């Protein structure tokens, strides 16, 4: 793999991330004269569903997306031994999960600045007919003051002619909407909105809104509604947005367009 990438102008560095069927490595691009990230996907190591269904979707989707708050893919390479390499923009600030883990809850103004960018990225995706389906703090990367979404491994292009209803569980349990956990036919875009609510909650509280160690208990908590630690003094507008994002009834949950108009995001 190292020789293959070197022959294509990339000097491999350290591993900066690891997925079920992939690794992300830092590299130096001689062509671009800068550091890049290379996601190495092992086609031979994954199950048939991943190879036949999810991987082709990811490769199709990342080719088409172009937004300042989405990690850019520069090039795709495939080695003779079935490894696919996605050469991507490198975000050197780590991810939101590590930021909160190391620094604690973010000030509301900082969370708002980052969350606005996530809203813009998802608004763009949904406008392109793409649902991410795996939004979580680990997939929100930081580059200075900018947030950039990554990992479209579970993403799906939605039909334009009618509303798509999915029954597939994708992503991480802690960030999954109640209808996704219950296997009810659901709108994947509304699932993204719920996951964004969990991301915002983690940014502000440095904890998850619901206990993901016990799924029946988690579903009960979700129906009961989100509560906030009193010592953090989260503003009324922000609490209102979080309650809307984490609305257990997907019909009542706002679309990404409606989220973008919320007073908390409009205020400075």
Swiss-Prot record:
The keyword Metal-binding applies. The modification Phosphothreonine is found at residue 168. InterPro entries: Kinase-like_dom_sf, Prot_kinase_dom, Protein_kinase_ATP_BS, TSSK3_STKc. Keywords: ATP-binding, Cell projection, Cilium, Developmental protein, Differentiation, Flagellum, Kinase, Magnesium, Metal-binding, Nucleotide-binding, Phosphoprotein, Serine/threonine-protein kinase, Spermatogenesis, Transferase. The lineage of its organism: Eukaryota, Metazoa, Chordata, Craniata, Vertebrata. Pfam families: Pkinase (PF00069). The keyword Phosphoprotein applies. Autophosphorylated at Ser-166. Phosphorylation at Thr-168 by PDPK1 activates the serine/threonine protein kinase activity. Its main location: other. The modification Phosphoserine is found at residue 166. The active site is at residue 134. It catalyses: L-seryl-[protein] + ATP = O-phospho-L-seryl-[protein] + ADP + H(+); L-threonyl-[protein] + ATP = O-phospho-L-threonyl-[protein] + ADP + H(+). This is Testis-specific serine/threonine-protein kinase 3. One of its GO terms (cellular component) is sperm flagellum. It is an enzyme of class 2 (transferase). Its cofactor is Mg(2+); Mn(2+). GO terms for biological process: protein phosphorylation; spermatid development; spermatogenesis. Serine/threonine protein kinase required for spermatid development and male fertility. It is found in: Cell projection, Cilium, Flagellum. PROSITE patterns: PROTEIN_KINASE_ATP, PROTEIN_KINASE_DOM.
């Amino acid at each position: 793999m190292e020789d293959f990438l070197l022959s294509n102008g990339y000097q491999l560095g350290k591993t900066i991330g690891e997925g079920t069927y992939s690794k992300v490595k830092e590299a130096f691009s001689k062509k671009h004269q800068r550091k890049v990230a290379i996601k190495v996907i092992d086609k031979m190591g994954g199950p048939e569903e991943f190879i036949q269904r999810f991987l082709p979707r990811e490769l199709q989707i990342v080719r088409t997306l172009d937004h300042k708050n989405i990690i850019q893919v520069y090039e795709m390479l495939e080695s003779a031994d079935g490894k696919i390499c996605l050469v991507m923009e490198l975000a050197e600030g780590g991810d939101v999960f590590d930021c909160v883990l190391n620094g604690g809850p973010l000030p509301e103004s900082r969370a708002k600045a980052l969350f606005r960018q996530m809203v813009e990225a998802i608004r763009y995706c949904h406008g392109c007919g793409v649902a991410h389906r795996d939004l979580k703090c680990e997939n929100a990367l930081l580059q200075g003051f900018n947030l950039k979404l990554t990992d479209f491994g579970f993403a799906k292009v939605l039909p334009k002619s009618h509303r798509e209803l999915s029954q597939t569980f994708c992503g991480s349990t802690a960030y999954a909407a109640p209808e996704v956990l219950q296997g009810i036919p659901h709108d994947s875009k509304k699932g993204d909105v719920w996951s964004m609510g969990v991301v915002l909650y983690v940014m502000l509280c440095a904890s998850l809104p619901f206990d993901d160690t016990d799924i029946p208990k988690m579903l009960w908590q979700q129906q009961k509604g989100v509560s906030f630690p009193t010592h953090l003094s989260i503003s009324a507008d922000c609490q209102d947005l979080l309650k809307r994002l984490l609305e257990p009834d997907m019909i009542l949950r706002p679309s990404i367009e409606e989220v973008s108009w919320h007073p908390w995001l409009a205020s400075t």
